[in-house]
Amino acid sequence: MRVADYSFELPDELIARYPTAERTASRLLSLDGNSGQLADLQFTDILEQVNPGDLMVFNNTRVIPARMFGTKQSGGKLEILVERMLDDKRVLAHVRCSKSPKVDSIVCLDGGYEMVMLARHDALFELSLQSDKTILEVLEEVGHMPLPPYIDRPDEDADKERYQTVYNQNPGAVAAPTAGLHFDDAILAALKAKGVNTAFVTLHVGAGTFQPVRVDNILDHKMHSEWAEVPQTVVDLIGETKARGNRVIAVGTTSVRSLESAAKASQGVLQSFSGDTDIFIYPGYQFQVVDAMVTNFHLPESTLIMLLSAFAGFDEVKNAYQHAIAQKYRFFSYGDAMFVTKKAN
């Protein structure tokens, strides 16, 4: 199980650095996991891919403006990327600067705010805000949207809206659940009118989602941990959907991982779930919950393309990606989408 098997060459011009003018203006590549059949569609054609009674499960996390800039006491510049909010004052964060800040040192943020460096946990720093305000209030005031490295441009005002789903609810993600970016209020209303049911889980996407896999063998990879919640109401809806013979369609790999984490935590019988998950899905995994998924095009050698290969078949996904590149689909967070049905076990 070599990581290199998931490598592919992507022309730089296919990396989407800006979203389409309208959320639903993206293209949609349909992949049937069983037959490997592909179809080139528009995103609005997703209405033809779903059936009345199907259940679409969305991740309602809200991206926080997690990137802050400031200086150390020495005057050296630094950049802080919040990975997780521990409470109203404390965060775990990545800190980029010439020399790591020491324990008990003060970090001065833009806007005049200060944070104290409490401890270091491997690559992450625990920082505490010295203010009457909450960390979320300060982030909303001085933070920047944490665009992924491959977008390769500073964040702009428009990103505050477009790097966020229209149904976001629970603040805590430092990366968008990007499959959801294609949905606007009109298409959600059209799905409802067709009789498609919707449900919401939460997974606060961490910066680890962009970390490259640094081992040669997939089995040696240690997955990053993220907080997820699957409410009992969603569990009940899934049970009703399956009993009718309808499909559970996960919008995004984060929704897939949330649902499969809930099943894994209760030994395959789906129950409500709230807590950290480091589930790593790669070929050989037996899916317990999800029948189809909406997803964007992922980075080479990423855990997300491994998840997709587990879902729809290694050869089928490889062929789909070659087709997408040849047809000049737009890749990654602001790019186009796929609608994928599961390959039978």
Curated annotation (Swiss-Prot):
<keyword id="KW-0671">Queuosine biosynthesis</keyword>
<dbReference type="InterPro" id="IPR036100">
    <property type="entry name" value="QueA_sf"/>
</dbReference>
<dbReference type="GO" id="GO:0005737">
    <property type="term" value="C:cytoplasm"/>
</dbReference>
<protein>
    <recommendedName>
        <fullName>S-adenosylmethionine:tRNA ribosyltransferase-isomerase</fullName>
        <ecNumber>2.4.99.17</ecNumber>
    </recommendedName>
</protein>
<comment type="similarity">
    <text>Belongs to the QueA family.</text>
</comment>
<keyword id="KW-0949">S-adenosyl-L-methionine</keyword>
<dbReference type="GO" id="GO:0008616">
    <property type="term" value="P:queuosine biosynthetic process"/>
</dbReference>
<comment type="function">
    <text>Transfers and isomerizes the ribose moiety from AdoMet to the 7-aminomethyl group of 7-deazaguanine (preQ1-tRNA) to give epoxyqueuosine (oQ-tRNA).</text>
</comment>
<dbReference type="Pfam" id="PF02547">
    <property type="entry name" value="Queuosine_synth"/>
</dbReference>
<comment type="pathway">
    <text>tRNA modification; tRNA-queuosine biosynthesis.</text>
</comment>
<keyword id="KW-0963">Cytoplasm</keyword>
<dbReference type="InterPro" id="IPR042119">
    <property type="entry name" value="QueA_dom2"/>
</dbReference>
<comment type="subunit">
    <text>Monomer.</text>
</comment>
<dbReference type="GO" id="GO:0051075">
    <property type="term" value="F:S-adenosylmethionine:tRNA ribosyltransferase-isomerase activity"/>
</dbReference>
<dbReference type="InterPro" id="IPR003699">
    <property type="entry name" value="QueA"/>
</dbReference>
<dbReference type="GO" id="GO:0002099">
    <property type="term" value="P:tRNA wobble guanine modification"/>
</dbReference>
<keyword id="KW-0808">Transferase</keyword>
<dbReference type="InterPro" id="IPR042118">
    <property type="entry name" value="QueA_dom1"/>
</dbReference>
